[in-house]
Structure formats: structure tokens, C-alpha cells
Amino acid sequence: MEAKTNNAKIKVVIVGGVAGGASCAARLRRLDENAEIIMVEKGPYVSYANCGLPYHVGGVIEKESSLLVATPDTFRVMFNIDVRTNCEAIRILPDTKTVELRNALTGEVTSEAYDKLVLSPGAKSVRPPLPGIDLPGIFQVRTVPDARAIREWVERGSLFLAGMDKYC
């Protein structure tokens, strides 16, 4: 990563904090100890073992905490990275090099300037337009909260049918 020519530190905003975003943030820190790095993640968790989610649903991985590779505190203490969870990038303004962020808990919208912007927002499950697709008991497994919802459904004694082609 190139340093700014006027001795100011470079500011990088990373959108997405799971696999790609978290890896990028850690690598950027190794490349530049002085960079200001901000990683924003729409969900409540960063850097988790998403390929382990089906195993957590099935009880092979019992503790949800076992899925968490790193926490926002880990990134702050070990890498000096500002991690903002429950924070969604809602608009990118390339002409002014700013990104608008919405706090999912408060609804507050803020603007963050950047020198470099990395987009690693992850994927979204395809939900076919089928009748009943939004009924209770229809789940997808992409995030830790998704896996938790399925486990809670099953623990209540509700029936559950799982099917997938390939996950990871």
C-alpha cells in the first residue's frame, strides 16, 4: 500500500468484516503500521467461521463462541483497527471519497471520508419467489444469527428439514 506523499497517514474504509474484509484489514495493517483502518460490518459479528455454521446448527460445534475467530476488540487491540459492527454502508460518493454509514441499532447516519475504499460485503442467499417463503420456519444459513435462529427453532421442538447443495 502506498503512503501519502505529504506524510499524512492513509485512511482505508473496508465495507464487510467477515472473511474477505477481516483478512484485508489484518493484511493492510501488516503492510502499513500507520494507516487509519476502519472496518464496517452490517451484522453483529466479524471474522467468524462461516463454513462452521451448519455444524453449529447440527450440534457438532456446540458453542456459538467457537465460531468466532476474532472480535472487534481483537482487531482494536492487536491491529489498531476501528471496527464498527451493526453498521451498514448505504451510499458511496466516489467524487468526494466518502461513504455514508447507518448504525443499525440507532438509525443514525454518518459520513466517513476515505483515501482507499475496499468492498467486501459478502453474499446474499437467493430466496426463490415461492409461496410461503417468508413463513415462520423457513431459514437461510449465512450468518451466526441465522444459525442461532435455527437452533432456537429446533430447541422449541419444532420440525426442521434442511437441504443444501454445496455450502463451502
Task: Locate each region found by the language model.
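Short helix-terminating capping/connector loops at secondary-structure junctions
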Residues: 33-34, 161-163
